[in-house]
Amino acid sequence: MASSDKAFTLDIVTPQKLFFSGEINSVIAPGLNGLFQVLKGHAPLLAALKSGKVRLSLSDRSEDTFQIAGGFFEVSGNKAILLTEEVS
C-alpha cells in the first residue's frame, strides 16, 4: 500500500536538515499539556512541543518512533510540519 485515503504528508525539519518527509496515517506528539494525535483532515493547528517521543503510523502500516527536543507542530490542510532543534 503506497498511499491510502487515510494518509497525509508530514515533514520533520531541524535547522540542519529535512529529517523525514513522507505519507503517514497518524502522528502522536508530545504537546506541552500532554500527548496529542493528528489524523488526515485534522483542523488547522499550531502547537508547542516538549521533549519526548513522536510516533508515526506510516501509510505502509509500519510504525516509526523518534525522540525530539521540543519544537513546534503545524497542521494546515493535509500537510503537517514538525519543527525541532534536534531529533534522533
Swiss-Prot record:
UniProt keyword Membrane present: yes
Lineage: superkingdom: Bacteria
Subcellular location(s) per record: Cell inner membrane
Keyword terms, alphabetized: ATP synthesis, Cell inner membrane, Cell membrane, CF(1), Hydrogen ion transport, Ion transport, Membrane, Transport
GO CC terms of this entry: plasma membrane; proton-transporting ATP synthase complex
Keyword Lyase among UniProt keywords: no
Membrane topology, as annotated: Peripheral membrane protein
Gene3D superfamilies, alphabetized: F0F1 ATP synthase delta/epsilon subunit, N-terminal
A Pfam cross-reference name: ATP-synt_DE_N
Any one GO molecular function term: proton-transporting ATP synthase activity, rotational mechanism
InterPro entries (alphabetical): ATP_synth_F1_dsu/esu, ATP_synth_F1_dsu/esu_N, ATPsynth_dsu/esu_N
Record family assignment: Belongs to the ATPase epsilon chain family.
Assembly and binders: F-type ATPases have 2 components, CF(1) - the catalytic core - and CF(0) - the membrane proton channel. CF(1) has five subunits: alpha(3), beta(3), gamma(1), delta(1), epsilon(1). CF(0) has three main subunits: a, b and c.
Function: Produces ATP from ADP in the presence of a proton gradient across the membrane.
PANTHER family found in the cross-reference section: ATP SYNTHASE DELTA/EPSILON CHAIN, ATP SYNTHASE EPSILON CHAIN, CHLOROPLASTIC
Identification of the protein by name: ATP synthase epsilon chain
Organism the protein comes from: Chlorobaculum tepidum (strain ATCC 49652 / DSM 12025 / NBRC 103806 / TLS)
Gene name per UniProt: atpC
